[in-house]
Swiss-Prot record:
Its cofactor is pyridoxal 5'-phosphate. NCBIfam families: ACC_deam_rel, PRK03910.1-1, PRK03910.1-3, PRK03910.1-5. It comes from Escherichia coli O45:K1 (strain S88 / ExPEC). It comes from the Bacteria. The keyword Lyase applies. One of its GO terms (molecular function) is D-cysteine desulfhydrase activity. SUPFAM superfamilies: Tryptophan synthase beta subunit-like PLP-dependent enzymes (SSF53686). This is D-cysteine desulfhydrase. Catalyzes the alpha,beta-elimination reaction of D-cysteine and of several D-cysteine derivatives. It could be a defense mechanism against D-cysteine. GO terms for biological process: D-amino acid metabolic process. Pfam families: PALP. Homodimer.
Length: 328
């Protein structure tokens, strides 16, 4: 098996059983194409989401190093920070979160509801900053301060997106391949591409397990020119960890994230409403709504390699719906 080296890495099994891979009959009828969805929005902790796959590896490494504190960073409405805080609570660890307000809003709902509300429930220590201009350096500086207070910190990068965390999505590719085997030949896979770990992990895994399927990353914060090196660098770092080759082309669409990260747009919100009304599934305004807008438009514009079945990776994020009200 090409991915056998995955078992060398310590991992905490937070998720347990595979998340569902479902056919969307009403949505498929609406679009005139077979659409399937991988339900990583229903992972078991803290209202679900994709970051739990990364945290299985990252938290295991933190415990191996004897850490008593998890430190990470993100936007006020970060899904990753929310799930990191929940994992810390479950493991009896302290959690410190460095947060920014990327959209510069003073709206009370954004500042206090959704993911931010959940951080308080998980007893997270919040440190605000003007902007995460150099998050790796800012996290290291925060870790130094926390260590000086007598804690043993473990730094988790934005999105959990380093080579170790991204192994969670190599593992996900294994799960997807097993669920599809003998059931459906997926032509294209669509995923939101942000901090790049989910995209890069899938790229490595699917290249070896489902090489005939194209993987499309719909960017949520950057142009192709800026996002491509992030995904490629992680793709190669993951492959090195697993002693594999990674030569699959990284495909990105950057037409759907404007006006910027964390700012809802009409196409994304229409996608959120459409899936809710046709399938009872909740997307979010920041990641999955925009990625689904890309899928919908990609079908309309014939951007996919053929007319075969499409798999959408649902990375979660529904708690943010409450923070963005009344814009939803």
């Amino acid at each position: 098996m090409p991915l056998h080296n995955l078992t060398r890495f310590p991992r905490l099994e937070f998720i347990g059983a595979p998340t569902p891979l479902e056919y969307l009959p009403r949505f498929s009828d609406y679009l005139g194409r077979e659409i399937f969805i991988k339900r990583d929005d229903v992972t078991p902790m803290a209202m679900g989401g994709n970051k739990l796959r990364k945290l299985e590896f990252l938290a295991a490494d933190a415990l191996r190093e004897g850490a008593d504190t998890l430190i990470t960073a993100g936007a006020i409405q970060s899904n990753h920070v929310r799930q990191t805080a929940a994992v810390a609570a479950k493991l009896g660890l302290h959690c410190v979160a460095l947060l920014e307000n990327p959209i510069g809003t003073t709206a009370e709902n954004y500042l206090t509801n959704g993911n931010r509300l959940l951080l308080d429930l998980f007893n997270t220590q919040i440190e605000m900053c003007d902007a995460l201009t150099d998050p790796n350096t800012q996290l290291e500086e925060l870790a130094t301060r926390v260590e000086a207070q007598g804690f043993r910190p473990y730094v988790i990068p934005v999105g959990g997106s380093n080579a170790l965390g991204a192994l969670g999505y190599v593992e996900s590719a294994l799960e997807i391949a097993q669920q599809c085997e003998g059931a459906v030949n997926i032509s294209s896979v669509v995923v939101a591409s942000g901090s790049a770990g989910t995209h890069a992990g899938l790229a490595v895994g699917l290249e070896h397990l489902m090489p005939e399927s194209e993987l499309i990353g719909v960017t949520v914060s950057r142009s192709v020119a800026d996002q491509l090196p992030k995904v490629v660098n992680l793709q190669q770092a993951i492959a090195k960890e697993l002693e594999l080759t990674a030569s699959a082309e990284i495909l990105l669409w950057d037409d759907y994230f404007a006006p910027g990260y964390g700012v809802p747009n009409d196409e994304g919100m229409e996608a959120v409403k459409l899936l809710a009304r046709l399938e009872g599934i909740l997307l979010d305004p920041v990641y999955t709504g925009k990625a689904m807008a890309g899928l919908i438009d990609g079908i309309s514009q014939k951007r996919f390699k053929d007319e075969g079945p499409i798999l959408f990776i649902h990375t979660g994020g529904a708690p943010a719906l409450f923070a963005y009200h009344p814009h939803v």
